[in-house]
Amino acid sequence: ALLNKDFRQSLGFAIDRTNYAAQLNGKEGGSTAVRNIYVKPDFVQADGKDFGTMVMDQLPSYGDEWSGVNLADSQDGLYNPEKAKAEFAKAKEALQAEGVQFPIHLDVPVNQSSKITVNQVQSIKQSVESALGKDNVVLDIHQLSADDFNNITYSASNAAAEDWDLSVGVAWDPDYLDPSTYLDVLKTTSSENTKSFMGYDDPNSQAVEKVGLKEYDQLVDD
């Protein structure tokens, strides 16, 4: 199901990031910690615009569902249950034609020793299942020891060891002042990172092609 773009977009619109952030920062500080884009919006500027604004200008060309999306920090510009439902409806029709059974179960591992992280994952479960309906999508949270969690995320020996669907167990900090310091991490040629971030070893697999990562490579290079 995760290979379906509409399904992935439905999940993106279904996650309440303010509530997620509030598990660490408190209710009043939840929104201030929200970021809606992988690259920090004001990380770099060109032609009088910051990076986030340049991306927002192009978003509508990706699909009508992206019109009006605000990528600025400290507000949840992506959480939209109505858009989530609309995207899921498109995905469900295609997935049913492929024989996918509902509800779709998504495995989500979490380090059980971190109460805050457990609460964050539970907040994702609540918002996704509320927006899309438990008869459509169920998040199965797997609370693991710190060692077991690390062995399937940060310290996984290979992609096959990363047997999960969603995870909060990955992170990245920039190394230099260019968007590529973020964007290159997700290129198919970034072998160690593709294993850790997206769970694949073979850059030429059918899944890589289907979700558009080869096209992503070209866009970053251009």
Where are these regions (language model features)?
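Append "and occasionally in soluble cytosolic enzymes with long acidic Gly/Pro-rich linkers
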Residues: L2-S130
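Residue-level recognition of the N-termini of beta-strands and the immediately preceding loop/turn
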Residues: V100-L106, N136-L139, W164
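Short helices/loops that flank or line small-molecule/ion binding pockets
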Residues: D6, Q122-S130, D147-W164
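Structural alpha-beta junctions
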Residues: E129-I141
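Short, glycine-/Ser/Thr-/acidic-enriched flexible segments
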Residues: S113, A171-P174
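Short secondary-structure boundary/capping segments
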Residues: K27-G30, I124-K125, A156-N158, T181-T188
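Short beta-strand and adjacent tight-turn residues that come in two discontinuous sequence segments
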Residues: D163-A171
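Extracytoplasmic/peripheral linker and loop segments enriched in polar/acidic and small residues
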Residues: Q9, F13, R17, A21, ...
